[in-house]
Amino acid sequence: KESMGAYAALFHQLGYNVLLPDARAHGQSQGHYIGYGWPERYDVRKWAKRLIRDHGPKSQIVIFGVSMGGATTMMTSGLQLPAQVKALVADCGYSSLQAELDYQAGHLYHLPMLVRIPVEGALSVINRVANGFFTQSASSTRALHHNHRPLLLIHGAADDFVPTKMVWQNYRATQG
């Protein structure tokens, strides 16, 4: 939440109302396990519905997220969303959890493919037990095939945590 404070302040100064929630298992939010955007997409939809309930049907909502929040934003785009959700902004979001895990295993930990495959398989099973889904399910690009809203994708070329190639995969996937 602290890293999003500057964005929230800017949007507020520009006259927008801002909802800045903690994602699952972050900050003051409930939950014991981070879902990497996949279960959180339902939370985002609930927050949008709550905003409409609290501020009226003329509300206009833009969903914005950075990194895992960017992936969450794109994963949310694949759901049936209220008409008041007008646009989405995803900054440095990954194309899929599996692709991001594979990239990190190779880039950060320098694991050879022969080791990565069984490790990632085990992580997927552990995640299924803890979070209720296999890591292969959490895909921004698959969700974006169902998106028809305007989507602004932002990604820096020097990003070494989420590879820049993923923004192009997301761009090609969206219908918005």
Predicted regions and their residues:
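Short alpha-helix in the alpha/beta-hydrolase fold that links the catalytic acid
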Residues: R149, P163-R172
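Glycine-rich "HGGG/HGxG" loop immediately N-terminal to the catalytic nucleophile
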Residues: L14, A25-Y36
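The serine-hydrolase catalytic nucleophile loop
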Residues: K1-L10
